Structure formats: C-alpha cells, structure tokens
C-alpha cells in the first residue's frame, strides 16, 4: 500500500485498476494525428515506442510529419515528442512502421514525398537508445524505382530476430501509390547492413502465383519467423491460377532470393463499404516457427466482421476463417481497423474498431468503440470480446479520410498495449490503453510533464555527476530520487542554486527526481 500511495502521489505509474477502461491522449495534436504504430523492445519489455502521423507547421506550411515517443516503464510515462525530418520542400510524411531487432536496436520506416511533380521515397531511421533519439534516415525506396508505378505506399518493415544466418536482416514490402492504376504488384527490398543499403527492388509474387491485372493496391503483409524465414501474404486474382480471388503465402529461406508459394485462402468476394479500413496483418509465433496467424475484416453476412486464419505447419496449409467479434451475426454492425500480437507464451490478442454499440447500421454517422479478444490456441477460438475504449466515440467524417487506416498493439505476459486514432475530443488524436487482458482492467497513465520552472538537470544521460541547477534561490529544499520501482534511492536537502550528485556508482537506468512537487526524469548510463 505504501508503494501504491507513493506512485499515485508522483503521478507517473499506476493510479488504480478500474472496471471502466481508461485511455490516455498520447499525441495531443491540434488537428490531425493518424495511423499510429507501437513497438516493444524484445530485450526490455518495459521499453515501448510509438510513432504516428502528426500535423506540423514548418517553413510556412502545414505538413504531416512522423512523431515518436518512448517509454521505459511499460507505458506509464512517455518521453517528449521527437519529429522525423522531411527531405524536400513541401514534402509530407506517412505510414510509420517500426521493428526492434533481437538486441534492442530499433528501426523506423516512413514515406516522405510530394505529388506534382512526384518525388520522394521510403526512408529508414535507426535508434540505439530505445527510441529517444534517431540517426539521419537513409533512403530505402525511391519514387521511381519502378517506372510509372511509384512504389512507396504502405511500407511494412520487419527484422529477422532468429539465431540463424539471416539474423538482423531487414525487409520492407511496399506497393504502388494510391493514384496508380493496375496492373500493380507487391514489392520488397532487403538490407543486411542495418538499412543503410538495400537490394534492387523486386516483386514478391511469382509465376503461377501472380497478383494479376485487376488489383489496385496489392498490399503484402510481411513477417519473419524464428527459424529465419521471410514470409508475406498478398492478394491475387488470376482465373488461370484460381477461379476465385485469393491470398497467397510466400516464404523465403534465403533473404528473398527465391520464394515458395502456398494458397492461403480463396473465396467468392462480397460487396464491402469502401469507407471501411480493410487492412490485414500476418504475425508469427515468437518461439514456434510452424505457427502463424492472419487477420483482417471480411465483408460477408451483410456487414464486415473480423476473421482470422491460422497455420500450424509453417504456412503450408491454413484453417478456415474464424469469426473473432462476438456480436450477433448479420446485424449490420461493421468491424474494421484490426491488429494482432502474440505474447511470449504464444497467446494472441486481436484488437479492432467496433460499431456494435450504435443503434443504427452502416458506416456514415455511426459511432464506434475499440474492442479486443484473446486466443490461447493460435486463433482457433477466442475469448469473450471486451471493450477497450473508455467511451463511445461519435462519428466524425475525418474517419473516412486517408491517414487513419491502422491501429497497433503489442502484448506481453497478460498486458495488452494499444494505440489508435479517434475523434472523441473533436479532432483526430492518438490514444493509448494499457490493459490487463485477462480481467479487462486498465491502468491509468499520466504523461509526465518534464518541463518545469524550478530547476534544470544536466547532463542527461549522466555518467559521473548529475548537476541540479535552480533558477532561483532556495532554502532547505528537500530532494528525493526514485528508481522505476517507486523506491527512494537518494535524498538530500539543498540550499544552493548549483548542486552536484555523484552517480558514478549508481546502477544504469531511469530515475525520477522530485523537488517541491516537480518531477523530472533522468538517465544514468
């Protein structure tokens, strides 16, 4: 109880567990924040990083830029916002995507481009400190890598975390820009030097397993497996290959030099509301290379449902679709904007946007919530659906626009971390939820305000000495320093404006200093 009261007083970790979900506005943008991504460090599950598209005024223009924040305490507090650079006058950014390697080195890919004249590409930045800082991004794809196809839309970045010869290899999949008419193909590139250089662009589909001439946006959903394979699922419609529209599963053991192909799913298509966010995802079990999970919205039974398919033989064969959402079948309430994640034990959490709580049906003027379900058997069955958003969100026409097509989640132990965009406050912002999945309880999160008018800390990170300089004279002012467990590790009383603390023997990590009600974070390295 003492520890609970201490952390509550500091407003940086658990406030309480509530039956009613709690959500935190993590972006606080003035107009538009969209399409967030969330990554967890495999070498430190308390290190989370989120990235999103946010409006920024720069050089006399309002442009979309990629913004990031990092957490080192499981999402209880977050760093100040970083902004990734643009690479041309009038450029805007989109589609952030991140991946940690097995050692905790973080990569971020994003688009930076403009139209008329078309220019730009896909860029990759790197962070060696858990997402606090980024190096200068390098270009992975150019707008003109394929003549007239502009292959820079919806890139997905994955990193090989295996202990095979492919360990550390980066892969990016992409597709032609939205304004490019078919025939189109899914593309990819490979990097073996942390994303500084890339192979020539190539297509994932192959002879006998072609995408075809009628699919406008053939997105490839990639993943790497624990045995060193690069895999992707992509759509196809070629009647000579299969009389039905279908998805193919491609896998490579040699860093994309060649692929094996298997049919994943084929079906008679049903009409779908094109306003729905129909993106799909492929994920791989963290310790069993045979287990894979594919999920996306499927418009049948008079509305869109979240459907999942799974494989237990490395993608050679797949189950039939399993309905994840448990509202009444065919009730006209559509689900979309889906994401999923395995935890360390191989359980799966699936999250999505859900309209079941609106009295009306359809898309326009229909409010929504966010829900999740858990599977303990690789997607064969699912738990009762649970609401994750803290309130019903009224419809706003901005949800029909581009730039808010995906949400994101990571899953560790029994804790589900999720980010999404919604319009509950009259603008599109990014919201964060930290949910104990088995009990559907959420942890109230406060974003630590690290600016104050009382004192400055430097250097930060500190190696030997931490300087505490006050902006005004002080008299007998107590200082307390806490570790991330909420324990007091140091205290003193100061009466000087300039003070120094020897931290050379302290354990490396993140600490919080509390002075006169002000709390600031610092790092000892």
Model regions: which residues?
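Extracellular, repeat-based ectodomains that mediate carbohydrate processing or recognition
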Residues: 20-441
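C-terminal outer-membrane/trafficking sorting elements
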Residues: 4-6, 11, 15, 447-525
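Intrinsically disordered, low-complexity regulatory segments in eukaryotic proteins
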Residues: 442-446
């Amino acid at each position: 109880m003492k520890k609970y009261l201490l952390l509550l007083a500091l407003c940086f970790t658990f406030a309480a567990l509530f039956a009613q979900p709690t959500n935190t506005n993590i972006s606080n943008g003035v107009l538009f924040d969209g399409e967030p991504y969330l990554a967890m460090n495999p070498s430190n599950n308390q290190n989370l990083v989120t990235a999103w598209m946010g409006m920024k005024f720069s050089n006399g223009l309002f442009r979309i830029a990629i913004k990031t924040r990092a957490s080192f305490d499981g999402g209880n507090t977050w760093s100040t916002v970083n902004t990734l650079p643009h690479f041309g006058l009038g450029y805007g950014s989109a589609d952030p995507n991140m991946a940690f390697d097995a050692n905790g080195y973080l990569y971020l890919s994003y688009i930076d481009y403009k139209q008329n004249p078309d220019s730009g590409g896909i860029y990759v930045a790197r962070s060696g400190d858990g997402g606090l800082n980024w190096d200068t991004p390098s270009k992975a794809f150019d707008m003109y890598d394929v003549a007239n196809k502009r292959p820079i839309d919806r890139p997905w970045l994955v990193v090989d975390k295996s202990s095979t010869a492919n360990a550390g290899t980066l892969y990016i999949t992409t597709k032609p820009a939205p304004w490019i008419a078919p025939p189109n193909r899914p593309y990819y590139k490979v990097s073996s030097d942390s994303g500084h250089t890339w192979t020539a662009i190539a297509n994932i589909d192959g002879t006998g397993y072609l995408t075809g001439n009628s699919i406008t946006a053939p997105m490839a959903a990639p993943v790497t497996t624990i045995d060193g394979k690069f895999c992707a699922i992509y759509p196809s419609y070629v009647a000579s290959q299969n009389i039905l529209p279908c998805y193919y599963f491609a896998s490579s053991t040699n860093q994309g030099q060649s692929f094996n192909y298997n049919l994943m799913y084929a079906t008679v298509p049903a009409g779908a509301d094109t306003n729905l966010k129909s993106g799909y995802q492929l994920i791989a079990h963290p310790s069993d290379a045979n287990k894979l999970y594919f999920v996306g919205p499927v418009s049948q039974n008079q509305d869109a449902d979240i459907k999942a398919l799974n494989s237990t033989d490395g993608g050679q064969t797949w189950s039939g679709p399993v309905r994840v959402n448990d509202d009444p079948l065919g009730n006209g309430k559509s689900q979309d904007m889906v994401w999923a994640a395995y935890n360390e034990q191989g359980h799966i959490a699936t999250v999505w946007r859900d309209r079941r709580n609106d009295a009306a049906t359809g898309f326009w003027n229909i409010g929504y919530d966010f829900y999740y379900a858990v599977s303990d058997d690789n997607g064969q069955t699912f738990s009762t659906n649970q609401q994750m958003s803290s309130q019903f969100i009224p419809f706003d026409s901005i949800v029909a626009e581009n730039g808010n097509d995906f949400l994101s989640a990571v899953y560790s132990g029994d804790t589900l971390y999720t980010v999404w965009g919604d319009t509950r406050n009259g603008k599109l912002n990014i919201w964060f939820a930290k949910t104990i999945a088995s009990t559907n309880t959420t942890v109230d999160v406060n974003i630590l305000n690290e600016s104050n008018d009382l004192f400055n800390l430097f250097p930060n990170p500190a190696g030997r000495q931490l300087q505490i300089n006050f902006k005004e004279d002080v008299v007998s002012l107590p200082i307390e320093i806490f570790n991330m467990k909420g324990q007091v590790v140091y205290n003193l009383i100061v009466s000087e404006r300039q003070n120094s603390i020897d931290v050379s023997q302290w354990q490396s990590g993140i600490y919080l200093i509390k002075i006169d009600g002000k709390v600031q974070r610092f790092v000892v390295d």
